[in-house]
Amino acid sequence: MENLLPLCVCALSLALLVVLGCAEKRRNEANRKKLRVAVNVNGIRGKSTATRLITAILAEAGYRVVGKTTGTAARMIFWDAEDEQEVVRRPHGISISEQIQVINSAVKRGADALVCECMAVRPDYQRVYQHQIINAGLTVITNVLEDHLDEMGPTTDQIAWAFADTIPYNGAVVIPDCEYTEYFKSVAEERGTRVFVADDSLISEEYLKQFDYRLFPHNCSVALAAANALGIDRETALSAMLKAHADPGALRFYDISLPKGDCCIVNAFAANEPSSSLDIWNIVCSERPEQSANPIILMNCRPDRVDRTKQFVRDFFPKIPNAVIIAAGESTGNITKAEAHGRFPNADRYINLEKQSPEKVLETLKPLLPGRIVMCVGNIHGSGEPILHALLEYGRLPLPEPIFRERRKSRH
């Protein structure tokens, strides 16, 4: 009889967990039904920006909308408050169950619309996130690029399959104009879902210049297509997007005046894969031809993002002419080996500053800065943000608030 006691306890505990899980599922479903609109923003790059822009559009259209970004600088954005709320995570870190609490808090606040950046990476988690938790009527796929290949890959085909699995049934989907457009359309047709293709040609350079931070046409065309899917007119959408605030870590150019020649710091950490980084590089070359003639490319590496480092080695560094390539952070070995094997023939030189302090990185950079662009790529996590702050302090520029404590300024 004594031997049965532990088994009984385990069985009762398991039964209790099942009961609690079922109860939570029912509560979440009941809360979800109270929302008129739910949007799931998926993709590789630009999800946080799209979430902010779509949230602003819904607010302008009169919805009581809550937006939620995820990742490094997770934030809750409210239609009725000027301050954003930092998402404080439990010790175990990011979990898709966090989304249940987001839906609950949005409903308690009186929201009738919710826009959420997809926080799941693994394909099976993405499926659960969309079809069992948020059940969004509109999915937005910003792009399909190489990243998170260890969890979603090994190729972009698998990434596209994962994103397609989050297309709703009998709803709407916004998709990019890319090699997977027809595939996404076919999945949407099977599910009885309307398709809206983002059209970058609808966004002019003149419009983008009205923002006080840098955006690509695609950032806005995705949000504009979402507005169309939601039945919100173009004029309302364009006006609303201008009121959305930048995500922490958004692309910005910082000019520093130096006695021997001005330099420009480009914070491109958020574009943490080669394709988006090359898009930014093309903007840099177009706007700053003299400073970009002999650039400094500063990459912050992470030990848990070695695949990302390999992607930069293969697809980014060889395409930047006359660059001083500086590797900082941890696990810089792939860059060091590639340089030793002559894989960066167009580079000026390579400097390995692995595990060096931000102060040491700054001291190394100082004599190289005059007349140059410093483009910061790779990862903001780890040494990235402290190095950026060290550079801005050296240039006597006001520091952006740390990404974990970003506050919104008034819209009025």
Q: Which positions does each model-derived feature cover?
A:
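Hydrophobic alpha-helical packing residues
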Residues: 54-59, 188, 339-340, 391
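Buried hydrophobic packing segments
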Residues: 54, 58, 106, 222-230, ...
